Amino acid sequence: MMEEVLSSSLYTQQVKKLYKVGELLGLDNETLETLSQPERIIQVKIQIRGSDGKLKTFMGWRSQHNSALGPYKGGVRYHPNVTQDEVEALSMIMTWKNSLLLLPYGGGKGGVRVDPKKLTREELEQLSRKYIQAIYKYLGSELDIPAPDVNTDSQTMAWFLDEYIKITGKVDFAVFTGKPVELGGIGVRLYSTGLGVATIAKEAANKFIGGVEEARVIIQGFGNVGYYAGKFLSEMGAKIVGVSDSKGGVINEKGIDVGKAIEIKEKTGSVINYPEGRKVTNEELLISDCDILIPAALENVINKFNAPKVKAKLIVEGANGPLTADADEIMRQRGIAVVPDILANAGGVVGSYVEWANNKMGEIISDEEAKKLIVDRMNNAFNTLYDYHQKKLEDHDLRTAAMALAVDRVVRAMKARGIL
């Protein structure tokens, strides 16, 4: 039983992907072994005094996977299911994501095993400060730069920053990204992931389906990423014909006003109450007729059972891992292009880079300038990947090509530095 759990763990899945790509790149086992292990894993015990006076204990981690291309970069999540395995796997994914986007970073990830809904604001602040007290020696604007992730936000980063300054005496705002604007954050960080998804969808549409103008788009998941992806795609001339959230969705061939849809979601709790169109389940939405499908909610929603029924001509992964390996293979056989999450949802970390770079230079950037930098970086990354795929790995899918390009860059950097 334990072997089954281990074999299906996120970390094991990532190592398998690495070895598969390593074979294509002709990497030896020694190199792959080095790449599969984090350079450092920090495990900490965090104890806080609850508002009821009782001591509460939580486990936390920070995984620093690889620093060949620069300081570690990646979010910190608060979730009851956080494990060391998950944090290590996510830090590895961040290494490849940062490499693919040509960002001057390695990969890192942090997490605390906690249900934040069960803590008061005061307890959350205490937890956040204690986490930094435990790991501050391993952080720095040129060492490891955390950011928000699941259940953490700009307020969490503000607590992190304040605690870091108190302990170290260094007033260095670039140690954390995703901060409030008052503390050197940038406004576009709010929508940078959705902007990135829309930008990639437009570029991919130009290459695979003849452009984004009038393209019919379905978005599964109407949270921050889904909403902003829809908003920007609408502005680019696409027609949003379907949206959904956890309660279900709506299809309207004439087009959905995303501004109106988000208002209805905020007022009633779900986009399923959008008045014009027909109500559908999430399962029905994924196999509805469209040109571009953007799964922006949960992982593994497109699998071997529904992949043969998907009618989209192009899939852009807004969520992390929305397609299973079986679904990937089915899409490849059907000739449906899939732009992988490692690129499609990387707008968030590009936004973080813009914030970090401006903090380092002591500059204040306008939202328009920041937006342009994110769009340009995403466009360049997509076109570089597309060319690499066409020239070197045309027989494989875009996901394999993205991983190969990212791993190759890290290996070259490690060789140049004499690590390998």
Curated annotation (Swiss-Prot):
Its EC number is 1.4.1.3. It catalyses: L-glutamate + NAD(+) + H2O = 2-oxoglutarate + NH4(+) + NADH + H(+); L-glutamate + NADP(+) + H2O = 2-oxoglutarate + NH4(+) + NADPH + H(+). It comes from the Archaea. The modification N6-methyllysine is found at K254, K260, K372, K391, K392. The gene is gdhA-2. Homohexamer. Keywords: Acetylation, Methylation, NAD, NADP, Oxidoreductase. PANTHER family: GLUTAMATE DEHYDROGENASE (PTHR11606), GLUTAMATE DEHYDROGENASE 1, MITOCHONDRIAL (PTHR11606:SF13). InterPro entries: Aminoacid_DH-like_N_sf, Glu/Leu/Phe/Val/Trp_DH, Glu/Leu/Phe/Val/Trp_DH_C, Glu/Leu/Phe/Val/Trp_DH_dimer, Glu/Leu/Phe/Val_DH_AS, Glu_DH, NAD(P)-bd_dom_sf, NAD_bind_Glu_DH. One of its GO terms (biological process) is glutamate catabolic process. PROSITE patterns: GLFV_DEHYDROGENASE (PS00074). Methylation of lysine residues may play a role in the thermal stability of this enzyme. SMART domains: ELFV_dehydrog (SM00839). The modification N-acetylmethionine is found at M2. The active site is at K109. GO terms for molecular function: glutamate dehydrogenase (NAD+) activity; glutamate dehydrogenase (NADP+) activity. This is Glutamate dehydrogenase 2. Belongs to the Glu/Leu/Phe/Val dehydrogenases family.
